[in-house]
């Protein structure tokens, strides 16, 4: 009875072990071209595809006589054969390893082999796992090319075989490994020391360098003394480099690194090497809207401002003058060692057309050119050398106002003018059109003396002043305040615009270009005939003196 029960129990165990899906032990009997024969102690040997016995490199990792685990797919497939699977057994083993690693917080070996939304895929010995982007490293990593295809250690942080879900972390491994090393490194870090590190990640603003458990930032501005557009110009991921610790915040575990600080600062005593005014050759490294940068030596660049590129066009775009990598001649204009700035000039290497004009055109010389533009304040005339001269409104005409005179000109007209003043330093040329003729005021003054009795035409008047036109471009003023004997109100009643009157020159105001006058009235003792001969009064104008005489008499009678 007991023997039969023991026999039945053993048989029941065999049944359990030989159910489909069970993992059983087998021995490799032979290896053929396409199949491997395995004896698992069943009714017959089973043929398993040889591909299931090859490793990642495509090589067989078994030999005849090896004992292996296989999965039982079917005891009888309908043709009297038992179906076994080495692949499913491997997968079963892989899950067991992952479960054990997860329970004991051990690391597993895997290979990053792809990128998916939110992270990467990792091959863990037949099992596909997910590696979140945030768990690749202790710092954000945008590019994992340097990690892909390599065997790396990971920690299993989530495992669900039913859902075939495995989540791993490389960051946890790094933090665990670096903990002791990191503490030791943090104790030894000091500002100013030189240390080795490996570039682990690049960003637009710099590179993160692994110093051995602690990452430091090598900012793009501390990579080289010269201008660097992108960190990849200086370093690459995986490079082992020497760096200098510039700043170290132990509390926040932040390390600022410098690469350029390992070399000599080219800005030291730069003013001695490049005094103002020296001419140099350099390479154009960059163009901007406001100018171009020129490298005059390794690590030293200067700015040619757009205003220093061309003598005649102040708003020209740099791309119209130079291109990146052009070798150009420049003049050092200014050096600010403290702010590390050099101002360079491109136009100064060429002839200054303003200076040239100043040397060849003295005051009074006549010039000609086309009108380039007309503004509210004058006329710009194009001159030789691509420069302009300005005729101010006040220098257009002797006889009429500038606002009226400018209406007689238009853009494109060819006109002549006289050079009045040249300021080469301020790049200004003053021209005059009216100066092409004699000044009618000066002519009039030279032909008339103080005290002379003359005729004039009333142009305008008010309670204080009478404006008298004496000739083209020449006017005089009569101020009632200068005639204390008269009543201005009575005089004003007799005055009419365009009346011809007799006046006397009291003085000349050359500064304001005005001739001061007084009324001249004939009395009974005056010899009208002699007066007419002196001032050439025509017969039809003879009455003007009598009219004014009567006006003065009336004014005096009211007193």
Swiss-Prot record:
Q: Which GO terms describe its molecular function?
A: mRNA binding; structural constituent of ribosome
Superkingdom of the source? Bacteria
Question: PROSITE patterns from the xrefs?
Answer: S1
The family annotation for this protein states: Belongs to the bacterial ribosomal protein bS1 family.
From which source organism is this entry? Buchnera aphidicola subsp. Schizaphis graminum (strain Sg)
- SUPFAM superfamilies in UniProt: Nucleic acid-binding proteins (SSF50249)
The free-text function statement in the UniProt record for this protein reads: Binds mRNA; thus facilitating recognition of the initiation point. It is needed to translate mRNA with a short Shine-Dalgarno (SD) purine-rich sequence.
Origin organism lineage: Bacteria, Pseudomonadati, Pseudomonadota, Gammaproteobacteria, Enterobacterales
Keyword Chaperone appears in the UniProt entry: no
| GO CC annotation terms, alphabetical | cytosolic small ribosomal subunit
NCBIfam families, per the entry: PRK06299.1-1, PRK06299.1-2, PRK06299.1-4, rpsA
Record domain S1 motif: where = 21-87, 105-171, 192-260, 277-347, 364-434, 451-520
UniProt KW keywords? Repeat, Ribonucleoprotein, Ribosomal protein, RNA-binding
The protein in question is named Small ribosomal subunit protein bS1
A Pfam family hit: S1
KW Cytoplasm (keyword) present: no
Give one GO biological process term.
Answer: translation
Identify the SMART domains for this entry: S1
């Amino acid at each position: 009875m007991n023997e039969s029960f023991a026999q039945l129990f053993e048989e029941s165990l065999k049944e359990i072990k030989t159910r489909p899906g069970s993992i059983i032990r087998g021995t490799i009997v032979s290896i053929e071209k396409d199949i491997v024969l395995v004896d698992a102690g069943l009714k017959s040997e089973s043929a398993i595809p040889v591909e299931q016995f090859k490793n990642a490199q495509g090589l067989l990792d078994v030999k005849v006589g090896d004992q292996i685990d296989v999965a039982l797919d079917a005891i009888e497939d309908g043709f009297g054969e038992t179906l076994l699977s080495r692949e499913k057994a491997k997968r079963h083993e892989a899950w067991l390893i992952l479960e054990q690693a997860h329970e004991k917080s051990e690391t597993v070996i895997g290979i990053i082999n792809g990128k998916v939304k939110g992270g990467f895929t990792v091959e863990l010995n037949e099992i596909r796992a997910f590696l979140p982007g945030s768990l690749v490293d202790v710092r954000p990593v945008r590019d994992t090319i340097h990690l892909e295809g390599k065997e790396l250690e990971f920690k299993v942080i989530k495992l669900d075989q039913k859902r075939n879900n495995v989540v791993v972390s490389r960051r946890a491994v790094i933090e665990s490994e670096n903990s002791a090393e990191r503490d030791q490194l943090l104790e030894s870090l000091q500002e100013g020391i030189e240390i080795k590190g490996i570039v682990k990640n690049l960003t637009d603003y710099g590179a993160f360098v692994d110093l051995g458990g602690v990452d430091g930032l090598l900012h793009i501005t501390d990579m080289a003394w010269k201008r660097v557009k992108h960190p990849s110009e200086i370093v690459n991921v995986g490079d082992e480099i020497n760096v200098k610790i510039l700043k170290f915040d132990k509390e926040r575990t932040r390390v600022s690194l410098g690469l350029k600080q390992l070399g000599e600062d080219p800005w030291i005593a730069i003013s001695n090497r490049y005094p103002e005014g020296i001419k140099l050759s350099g390479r154009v490294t960059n163009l901007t809207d406001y100018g171009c940068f020129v490298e005059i030596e390794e690590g030293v660049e200067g700015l040619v401002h757009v205003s220093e590129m061309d003598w005649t066009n102040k708003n020209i775009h740099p791309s119209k003058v130079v291109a990146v990598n052009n070798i150009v001649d420049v003049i050092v204009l200014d050096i600010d060692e403290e702010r590390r700035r050099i101002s360079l000039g491109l136009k100064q290497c060429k002839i200054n057309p303003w200076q040239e004009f100043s040397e060849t055109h003295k005051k009074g010389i006549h010039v000609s050119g086309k009108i380039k533009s007309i503004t509210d304040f004058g006329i710009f005339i194009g001159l030789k050398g691509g420069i302009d001269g300005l005729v101010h409104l006040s220098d257009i005409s002797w006889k009429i106002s500038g606002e009226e005179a400018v209406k007689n000109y238009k853009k494109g007209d060819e006109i002549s003018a006289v050079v009045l003043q040249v300021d080469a330093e301020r790049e200004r040329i003053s021209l005059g059109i009216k100066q092409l003729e004699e000044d009618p005021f000066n002519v009039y003054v030279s032909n008339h003396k103080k005290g002379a009795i003359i005729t004039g035409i009333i142009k305008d008047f008010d309670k204080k002043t009478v404006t008298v036109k004496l000739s083209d471009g020449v006017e005089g003023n009569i101020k009632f305040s200068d005639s204390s004997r008269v009543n201005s109100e009575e005089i004003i009643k007799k005055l009419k615009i365009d009346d011809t009157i007799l006046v006397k020159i009291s003085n000349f105001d050359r500064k304001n270009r005005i001739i001061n006058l007084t009324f001249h009235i004939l009395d009974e003792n005056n010899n009208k005939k002699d007066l007419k001969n002196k001032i050439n009064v025509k017969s039809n104008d003879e009455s003007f003196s009598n009219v004014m005489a009567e006006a003065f008499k009336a004014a005096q009678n009211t007193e």
